[in-house]
Amino acid sequence: DASGRIARATGHADGEPLEVSGRLFGLAAGAANTAALLLRSGIANSSGLVGTRYMVHNNTHIAAIDPRRTNDVVFQKTACVNDFYDDMGDGYPGGTLQLIGKVQASMMKTHARRAPLSMLKPMAARSMEWLVMTEDTPDPANRISLDSQGRITVSWTRTNYDRHELLLAKARELLKGAGYVAVFEQRFDISMNSHMCGTAVAGDDPRASVVDHDCRSHDHDNLYVVDSAFFPSSGAQNPALTIAANALRVADLVPA
């Protein structure tokens, strides 16, 4: 409206036009769609930073195989190693190693199409799977934008990948030292789009950020962004609990 506040949101639901009016608006569509909604609406972007600093973590899936024993686990995602999170031994941070859900032979075949299931089944039965996660750093060139039809486009290149390579090497060393003679890797690229964050960065300076430290838009005092878009950096952990904790924090600050 004339005062700069958001008066209503319009869209479609089940093919029908929809309009919602309100006193306060909270946006939590995920970092990509939050940026797209703001860009399509032409709001909250006096800084020109909406959509920039897109981050998705540097991730690699590892399958480690020990031919001497089978892995009969049901719920494998039960452990996380943070020994290298703050320091990789060189004074600089690394990341986290975490168990992930048990991989089956049919899942392996999607990445090894020519391999017969008769070979993959004993491999899957003797494998243990880990996720190696390190921080990707915010780069203004990594961004969400819209094409001429208003569709989302992603511009992205890896950042801070040397730290990822170091943690991968450490993971291989540890696993082989524990008797896992074969270690296979699947490096995630942008198609995985994991843990997206950072497209509506928080900060105190309206010229250098989209929302303030309470996740309120610098441009519209009744608009809050409460998903991972506000992240100034990505860290090297799953972001869901941080998103939830911050949303609860912001909810307590919103005027009743």
What are these regions (language model features)?
Residues 45-165, 196, 218, 225-232:
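FAD cofactor-binding and catalytic pocket of flavoenzymes
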Residues 233-254:
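A conserved FAD-binding loop/helix module that cradles the flavin
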Residues 2, 159-234, 240:
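A glycine-rich dinucleotide-binding beta-alpha-beta segment and adjacent secondary-structure elements
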Residues 1, 9-75, 227, 246, ...:
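Glycine-rich loop(s) and the adjacent beta-strand/alpha-helix scaffold that form part
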